[in-house]
Amino acid sequence: MSEKKRGRGRPKGSPNKPKMELITERQTLTNNADVYEILCQADIVAQEDEAKAIHGLTVFNDRNGAVLPILRWAFDSNINSTLPEGPTPYNKNEAPATDLAETSLRFEHKLFKYFVTEEVPQTRRETMWIELLEGIPQKEAELMELVKDGVWPFPNVTKSLAEKAFPNITFN
């Protein structure tokens, strides 16, 4: 006689479910590291030494211009997404490595202004969003989906850490 199973695992809306799979071990980042890798490493380093995490964010923001716009979108209460909430229907980029994807947030962060204002019609804005998600690496697309919905997956990269890393920028 077989034993009865006890429970079905974690319930669907469980609060302790990770928002996104993060890198958990420290790595040396290359000069062309993508935003997901930079923020994962900043999250790991911030657990041990906040000053090193701040320095890393400022250095890698100079190399990848998308770090600061993502932090502003995530932490600035004056910046609100004009895109519909919930998952976006798009075809995930199947590039085997992040540097083999069609594009990266490093080049596409200039489009962010259209996703937080009413400058373009809603249908065009949603089309631009889907095209952005389909062109960038999968992990960056997952990150952008969460940021769009107001969810921040990096618990140690906080608003105060961002304010210390970029003192000349105001995060309201």
Residue ranges and their predicted role:
Residues E3-N172:
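N-terminal nucleic-acid-engaging modules of covalent nucleotidyltransferase systems
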